């Protein structure tokens, strides 16, 4: 999965995802996307306008907490084996490496196994 870090809407949420090593989404209509994650799903954290900045593997345990004064308005999962990239992997490089386009309009979107593997190879070879 590719999960946008909400940077353009709220820098605090972006920073929390990195510091707390978690995949989060906020508010009805978006937060429910986190429910799709299964244990050991690979999640790339994507900062809008920058690229993939980190990744980890979902622990499979959905958690909820208060966000901006609203009870259970943040859904999240911890990310195991969390890694922060030395430099962001931008959208153009993602598309080039995977040999396909991605739509970044959604908060979170799935990518196929082959694309995931190609992007991970690129990260391991050039971004860690």
Task: Please give the residue ranges for each predicted region.
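Short, polar loop/linker segments at the starts of domains and inter-domain junctions
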Residues: 12-24
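Short, well-ordered loop/turn sites that connect or cap secondary structure elements
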Residues: 36-38
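Contiguous surface segments at macromolecular interaction interfaces
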Residues: 1-5, 9, 23-29, 67-128
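Short beta-strand-centered aromatic/proline hotspots
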Residues: 52-62
